[in-house]
Amino acid sequence: LFECSFSCEQEKEGDKPCKKKKCKGGWKCKFNMCVKV
């Protein structure tokens, strides 16, 4: 399993916009983890 983004706050680095980690096809985010759909 892979971690998804927690909150925007934790993803921010300095003045860069936050980027949310996406799950790939066939997976979805659930409880901050990528799970099979």
Curated annotation (Swiss-Prot):
Ordered alphabetically, the record's keywords are:
Disulfide bond, Neurotoxin, Postsynaptic neurotoxin, Secreted, Toxin
SUPFAM superfamilies, per this entry? Answer: omega toxin-like (SSF57059)
Cellular localization per UniProt: Secreted
Q: What is the predominant subcellular site recorded for this chain?
A: secreted
- InterPro entries on file: Hwtx-2-like
Q: Which GO terms describe its molecular function?
A: toxin activity
**Which Cys residues form disulphide pairs?**
C4-C18, C8-C29, C23-C34
Tissue distribution is:
Expressed by the venom gland.
PROSITE patterns, per database record: HWTX_2 (PS60022)
Q: Name one GO cellular component term.
A: extracellular region
Protein purpose: Lethal neurotoxin that blocks neuromuscular transmission. Acts cooperatively to potentiate the activity of huwentoxin-I.
The text of the family note is: Belongs to the neurotoxin 12 (Hwtx-2) family. 02 (Hwtx-2) subfamily.
Q: Which proteins does it associate with, and in what oligomeric form?
A: Form 1 and form 2 may dimerize.
Q: What is this protein called?
A: U1-theraphotoxin-Hs1b
Q: Which organism is it from?
A: Cyriopagopus schmidti
Q: What is the lineage of its organism?
A: Eukaryota, Metazoa, Ecdysozoa, Arthropoda, Chelicerata
